[in-house]
Amino acid sequence: NEYKSFDFSLGFVFTPAEEYLDLEFRKKMKENNRITYLGGKPEAIKLGIFNEFDFAIAIHSMGGEPTRRSIELNCNLAGFLYKYYTFLGKPAHAGFAPQAGINAYSISTLFNTALGLFRQQIDEKYMVRINPVILDAPMGTNVIPDKIKIGTDIRAHSVEYMLELSERLDTIAQCSAKALGGDVKIETEMGYLPFLQSHYLSNFVRETFKNFPEIEYCKENSPVSAAGDIG
């Protein structure tokens, strides 16, 4: 009951667009000056929604089928940035004169292969995740593809290491394109920052839940490579 002697108020804030999805739609909103940032909480910060608050507690439910009621504390989240690599080649008839073309799809394949081999050099203490996917690939079986757009996130628990990896991936992309005589257009987009939880505040949460026998278990200090705009 100690909290009853404190002078405080409690507010609940619900923010949209936590997941970093529907990016083309959000970019159009940004171009039309409807938003400034692509994520919900950064936009809320810009709008001053959190100005009246001294600190925040984020609560996130998890999936799965737990065998007992539990909570989790001090689960750090990764941050991420987003990369776009548009590999440019030269079209040609795949049957009549394939030698006259430069295969952008082959360049992207070389990039993915090099990225897989580079994985051995990544420092795992930062819990890095990289997941390249094809975003745009206008292709036909009788034409050497001249344009492939790859998108990937770079997740890590360190902003500095994310930026270092970004430069390494740029080099891999540029060298892959150069090796086959093509070119690459590179775009970098910042996503969310890592979320490093306050162990000091978590102590109060832990002590509070000790008063609730319904909570049988408290999991702690299990960082993950997932990200969230709470960072």
Range-by-range predicted roles:
Residues 106-231:
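Metal-dependent amide/peptide-bond hydrolase catalytic core
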Residues 1:
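Di-metal (Zn2+ and/or Mg2+/Mn2+) metal-binding site signature of metallo-dependent hydrolases
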Residues 6-129, 138-142, 227-230:
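Histidine/acidic-residue-rich, glycine-tolerant segments that coordinate divalent metal ions
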